[in-house]
Structures are given as C-alpha cells and as structure tokens.
Amino acid sequence: MAVISMKQLLEAGVHFGHQTRRWNPKMAKYIFTERNGIHVIDLQQTVKLADQAYEFVRDAAANDAVILFVGTKKQAAEAVADEATRAGQYFINHRWLGGTLTNWGTIQKRIARLKEIKRMEEEGTFDVLPKKEVALLNKQRARLEKFLGGIEDMPRIPDVMYVVDPHKEQIAVKEAKKLGIPVVAMVDTNADPDDIDIIIPANDDAIRAVKLITAKLADAIIEGRQGEDADVAFEADTQADSIEDIVEVVEGDNA
C-alpha cells in the first residue's frame, strides 16, 4: 500500500524535473532519465520516500510535535497555508525572515506586537486614535500578518519542518539544521539534498504537485493526532503506471 499512487503522481506532473543544464548532480540517484532536455524524476523512488515521509510526520504528530510548513514561492504559498491550517499546524508562505528560528526571541517580540495591535482594535482603541495613526497601525499589522501570521500561535520552535523547494528556502533549512530540527522536503532536480533528512523527489514548481504532496503530509498529521487510520492509502497500479509509462507520458507531453 502506498499513501500516494503512481497514477496520482503522474497526473500531478510530479515527475517533471528541471532542464538538464540546471541540475544538481547530487540528485542523480533520484533521476530516471532525460527527455528533450528535461530530467525525469524516478517516481518509484518518490512513492517509497513519500511513504517514509508520511510515516515520519504521522509519528511525530502522534507525539504532539509542532510542525512548521515552509513554502514562499507563489506555486506553494496557497497550499502551504491551507494544508498547515487544516492540520492544525503553522506556516510561513511569504518571505522567510532571517533568524525566524535561530533568533526566536526577537520573532516572538514581533508576534507580541502583532497581537497588541489586534487587541487595540478589538478593545476600541482605534476609535479614539487619530486616523493617521490608525492607518499606520493597520499598515504595520498587515506587514506583520503577512510574514508572521502563520506562526502567530506557534508555541515554540518547531520539532519538524516541511519545506517546499529547499533550493529557494536555503536560509530556513540552514536554521533548522543548526538547531537540529529534522527537515522533510519536496526536492527537485536542481536542489542540494544534503541537508534534508527525508527527501521527497518531486517537481516543486507545479501547483498540482505541491498541493498533492503537501496535502498528503497534512493527512499524516491529522492521522497522527487522531490515532487512527485515515483513508489515505492507495494500491499502486504497477502495470498501468510502470516506470516505462512515465517515459511515454513525458515524451507525449514534450512532443
């Protein structure tokens, strides 16, 4: 049983890597072939590694882990926010602020300021302040919410971090590694996998691919918290979705 089937991965375009000239040689073992200048990710490995990631995240959630979803590229922002929220976890889906983890005390002060501004509005303080001052406070709140709203209620530094595109999120990954926080990530063919604890080889530029993987890890959290099996497993159709079929799909899409 696989938590994500080969068919689902194919339909979401998870197999499409980057142009061969943009590859990172460290990802060679996760690449099946090359077609028309594009690397094709070995989805048989993706299926297995997605299972490992699912189990790891599920078990962490069962032990009340705090899990942070990170994906600031436009293709990932919506899925990261939606799925982290659905799983009752936390997210950063705009620019990563340097020191978010390694300088957590300072970040907490900014979060406290965000909560203070919200409280001022709720208590009616805005009603007695000059309009210009209220406008400045609203501008400050909007900026704080944009960058910190997803971790506003995060009780502590996360126990696990899930990353979409560690090539883009290098600062976040380095901070996690410095603090010994395990990193699960969607890793495309252009990224360095060395600092990733659990690699999910995948196209991190397609919205459908990001949504599929991210939603599955949210399912893992929900299952872990509920302590029961969710209906998330699928039988892989090894005949209809063999590795040879992947090549045919790629050739067809790139014809």
Curated annotation (Swiss-Prot):
Coiled coil: none annotated. GO terms for biological process: translation. It comes from the Bacteria. InterPro entries: Ribosomal_uS2, Ribosomal_uS2_bac/mit/plastid, Ribosomal_uS2_CS, Ribosomal_uS2_flav_dom_sf. The keyword Ribosomal protein applies. Keywords: Ribonucleoprotein, Ribosomal protein. Gene3D superfamilies: Glucose-6-phosphate isomerase like protein, domain 1, Helix hairpin bin. One of its GO terms (cellular component) is cytosolic small ribosomal subunit. PANTHER family: 30S RIBOSOMAL PROTEIN S2 PROKARYOTIC AND ORGANELLAR, SMALL RIBOSOMAL SUBUNIT PROTEIN US2M. This is Small ribosomal subunit protein uS2. It comes from Streptococcus pyogenes serotype M6 (strain ATCC BAA-946 / MGAS10394). The lineage of its organism: Bacteria, Bacillati, Bacillota, Bacilli, Lactobacillales.
